Amino acid sequence: MNDLHQRILLTADDGSRGPLLRIADDRLPPGGSYGRHPHRAVDVVAVVLSGSLRHGWGDGAVVGAGDVAVLRAGTGLDHDETAGDDGVRVLQCYLRSADPAAPPSHEVHRGPRGWVELGRSDARLWVARVLPGQSVTAPAGLLVLRGADRVVVEQQSGGPVPEAGAALVWQLDTARPAWAE
């Protein structure tokens, strides 16, 4: 993982954000890699902001800018992710697995706008790409916004996205989960 430049935007492993554990803003240079690593009992939702990322498990999918990949680790897997020729900037969002006994799976949603199907009832993800001068109204929830020169994470009650860029909103069942008590 020595190619990785990572900034942790949010950690909530105490259950205060329901199933959401962490959001990381990751950057890899062209051909850079996370290195082979394991996951178990976690769902990783990767939102590619720029560049591309090849997933080294399953079908070896390439996830491009604007795509959302959902990795359900379930019973566990080892994998690697490698940046394409243009490098990659990706928001990696980690959620406690909705079904830790399920076999691992991986799917890619190509360029979604609006709600992304995550296959779980305790977390919903809304995605938009806001162009300069465009007005987009986001739903209430935890807003993650990548503007021209910053990434912000803030709880908001819904309304206009404040600046151009990639916007995500997490709606989470924040009732304190049994594992956090």
What are these regions (language model features)?
Residues 1-181:
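Jelly-roll (double-stranded beta-helix
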